[in-house]
Amino acid sequence: MGPVDLPLLPRAVTMAAEVNTMKLTRTLLLGLAWAVALTAAWAEPDTQALCKDRGYPIGEAGRANNWFMNECVRVGSFTHQGEIVGIFNGRSNEMQPAAEPMVLNKAEREPDYRWWVGSERLRIDDYMKRQRVMALLIVKDGVIQVERYQYDRKPTQRFLSNSMAKTLTAMAVGIALKEGRIRSLDDRAEVYAPALTGTLYGQTSVRHLLRMSSGAKFEERYDGKDDLARYGAAARQGSAADGAKVITERRHPAGEVFNYASAETDMLALVLRGATGQTLSAYLQTRLWQPMGAQTSSLWRADSTGLERAGGNFNATARDYARLGLLLAYDGQRPDRPDLGEIIPAAYLIEATDSKQHPPAFAPYKATPYFGYGYQTWTFPGQQRRFALLGVYGQAIFVDPARKLVMVHLAANATASAGQTSMGRERTLLWQGVVGHYGPW
């Protein structure tokens, strides 16, 4: 049979074939568009300082904390921290992913987000050109609206949380409280962590540790000479409990003043291990990470005793950070599986993230010149409940529960404090601009 001799098919069959072809073409084009969007098509900032010519090298552990302090290795180290040998003289504790990952569909096209920075009107690509962002995700109603990577980073790579991990630790406290493993937030830490008995932190309540209001004299500047370095050196020689012994001066009565101190999150990890009999990773794997629907395993750096350094040092993919943000945005429930109920107790989560449920000293403009502080979480000014998980060098997860909006921002900023560069201001304007796309801030 020659080409001209093909039989005529029924119209219904040919129409079905045409529809299937159109669907396949549309799917392929959408996939191609997202593949292009994932890859930087703009001039990436500061590639020389970040050592692109050396393939974004990975730093090393040791006294100099090369992996953390050296700008040249920041991109490589912040996407391989879980694998660097010798950090805290320990290894990484792993949380296995879920059998059924949370569904994260992608929008057919990106919204045209625009916002003002001074006299300039910016879009997403403009922001990426201006800031050292390794990954940026915007998720609305459980659907990815924007996903960008630069500096040769990929969706499959784990990114370092820095202090965003503190909120994860706080959520573990809430789960343990609901289970009765922690009887009261007003119990002293030493009730659950006998190794802290007699120390300043041991005599501080769990609630005051959650709010970073122990009253301890503690300066955190990330210069290798501050109280964080002094605490870290003692902890490396032994454990977090040994680190607690060098923090001895209480400048203010507990509960009265917010003072940022990463050591207080490590104390919560000790409390949780004593209360649950498990490491933080083992406890959260079956209670949060897998129920949440994580797609990829996570790594959490631990010391020589197996205790996670809970104030940071957590490593996960950008999409799994987005899933965590969605869990928080939906008040502890999984948006694609509401039948699972509360994974994080809603009442506790709302208390942790609502500035109105904390004393005035922890309110926005009081705790800091802009942010307020809840339970290991930063709260925004305004009537609407909005909050963020923040980490040094530009890490952030923005959460707007009312709009079911999450933004993941993973970066390699030039300075530990984003506010010391243009990133601090411009990231806030990005958040406000995206929120403004959907309604008033």
What is the meaning of each model-derived region?
Residues 142, 160-185, 209, 268-272, ...:
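Active-site SXXK
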Residues 113-129, 143, 154-156, 176-258:
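Active-site-proximal loop and beta-strand segments within enzyme catalytic domains
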Residues 170, 264-271, 312-334, 395-411:
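Active-site-proximal alpha-helical segments within enzyme catalytic domains
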Residues 160, 179-217, 249, 274-312, ...:
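Active-site helix/loop module of the DD-peptidase/beta-lactamase fold
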Residues 14, 19, 41-154, 182, ...:
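N-terminal leader/targeting segments and the immediately adjacent pre-domain N-terminus
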Residues 284-285, 290-354:
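Active-site-proximal binding-pocket segments
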Residues 29-39:
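Bacterial N-terminal signal peptides
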Residues 295-298, 353-406:
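Active-site Gly/Thr loop motif
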